[in-house]
Amino acid sequence: ADVPGNYPLDKDGNTYTCLKLGENKDCQKVCKLHGVQYGYCYAFECWCKEYLDDKDSV
């Protein structure tokens, strides 16, 4: 089953890019900013587990 989640957006509506795939401290910080406890770097963009609201940019 697919785990729900999404790519959070910054205040300019862009995804957060990342260089280190998989576990990524920067992505963890980004996801926590968006109220989600866990995330990682996938396809060079931060992806947050169980993050559903892509309109809540920070």
Swiss-Prot record:
It comes from the Eukaryota. Has the structural arrangement of an alpha-helix connected to antiparallel beta-sheets by disulfide bonds (CS-alpha/beta). Disulfide bonds join 18-41, 27-46, 31-48. It is found in: Secreted. GO terms for molecular function: sodium channel inhibitor activity; toxin activity. GO terms for cellular component: extracellular region. The keyword Disulfide bond applies. This is Dortoxin. Keywords: Disulfide bond, Ion channel impairing toxin, Neurotoxin, Secreted, Toxin, Voltage-gated sodium channel impairing toxin. Belongs to the long (3 C-C) scorpion toxin superfamily. Sodium channel inhibitor family. Beta subfamily. Pfam families: Toxin_3 (PF00537). Expressed by the venom gland. Residues 3-58 form the LCN-type CS-alpha/beta domain.
